[in-house]
């Protein structure tokens, strides 16, 4: 499978049709795999809840466009922002276990690859 502009554009079209203005594409062979890896296309205006993962860290790498990962303390105050630029000086971040965070595109659409250990477990995601 090629991860090419045609695939990104197809996912972006689905994101445009989604009220959330984002769409993911599962890169796993099966939902039974003991790990998560996906492409996420984020469009301007998408809102992601501030959240954290209580059972795993998360790797986020921007492969198209620009995105900002924002980190928060337990009271919802911003503690750090990291601009991720595809092909740039800082294309990605590792979000530690239990670290509050959110992501947003900058200056247009952004495509990121996200990976996490373990099967998807909605019980392990908390929102602020």
Please state what every model-predicted region is.
Residues 59, 108-125:
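A short hydrophobic beta-strand segment most commonly corresponding to one strand
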Residues 49-51, 69-71, 92-95, 101-106, ...:
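Short beta-strand His + acidic residue motifs that chelate non-heme Fe in jelly-roll/DSBH
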Residues 39-55:
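Conserved short histidine dyad/triad with adjacent acidic residue
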Residues 35-37, 56-58, 90, 109-110:
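Short, surface-exposed beta-edge/turn micro-motifs
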Residues 1-35, 81-86:
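A short, N-terminal "cap"/entry segment at the start of jelly-roll beta-barrel domains
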Residues 73-98:
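Short acidic-glycine-tyrosine-enriched beta hairpin
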Residues 55-75:
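Glycine- and acidic-residue-biased ligand/ion/polar-headgroup-sensing regions
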